[in-house]
Amino acid sequence: MQQFPLYKQHDSMLCGITCLRMVCKHFGVSYSAEFLSSLCIEGREGISLLALSKGSTRIGLKNECGLVGITEIQNILPCILHWNQNHFVVLYKVKKGKTFYIADPAKGLVKYNLEEFKKHWVSTQSGGEEKGIAMFLEPTPAFYEKKMDEEPKEERSFKFLFGYIKQYLKYYNAIKFNGMDINLENSIVNYIESICK
C-alpha cells in the first residue's frame, strides 16, 4: 500500500487546514496550505469543523460531520477526526478493527491500538456506545474536473503572512516604530487589509 501523504503544520492553528490538504493530496489534487486557509474562515482558536466543511465544499469535496461510533469511522476512509478535543488528525487506515493509522500534522504518521485511539478520540457516550467527532470527505466529479486556480505566489504568500500575523495581534496593544506608538488595530491592519482586497 502506498504511504499516506503527510504534511506538517507550520503553526498550532493550522492542523485542520493541514488535514484537509493531506486528504486532497490522497485524492490526487494538491493545494497549498495558504490557498486552503483562504477558503476556510479562521476563528480565534483556529479552524473550526464548520469552516473546514465550507472550505472542502468549495473545492468539490462532499462532506458529512457528526458524532459517530468507532465502527462507523472505519467505513469511509480517510476521515478527519477531532483529536484530544483541541486538534485535528486524519484517520487513513484501520487494521482488523484493532490498529488505527493516523496522519497527525503535528507528530507525523502514527499508529495506535484500540484503547490508545479511544483515549484520544472518544468525546462522549451515547446509547451505550463511545463516540467522537469525525468529518467524512468524498470527492465529487467537480473536485477532479476543475482544480480551483490559486492566486499568484507573491500575493498568496503576503495574504497568508498577514492572516498568520493578524491572529496574534490580540496579544499586542501597540508597538514602537521609529520612536512613535502606532496602534496596530488602526494603522497597520487597516493598511494591509486595503492592500489585500
Predicted segments, located by residue:
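Polar low-complexity intrinsically disordered regions
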Residues: 1, 86, 166-170, 191, ...
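Cysteine-nucleophile protease catalytic domains, especially the papain-like/related folds used
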Residues: 1-68, 75-77, 82-88
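A broad detector of the eukaryotic-type serine/threonine protein kinase catalytic domain
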Residues: 2-3, 41, 142-144, 178, ...
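Generic alpha-helical segment signature
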Residues: 13, 29, 151-154, 190
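Noncatalytic regulatory segments and standalone regulatory/sensor domains
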Residues: 17-19, 40-47, 53, 73-84, ...
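Aromatic-residue detector
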Residues: 31, 93, 190-193
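Transmembrane helix-loop-helix hairpins at lipid-water interfaces of multipass membrane proteins
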Residues: 173-197
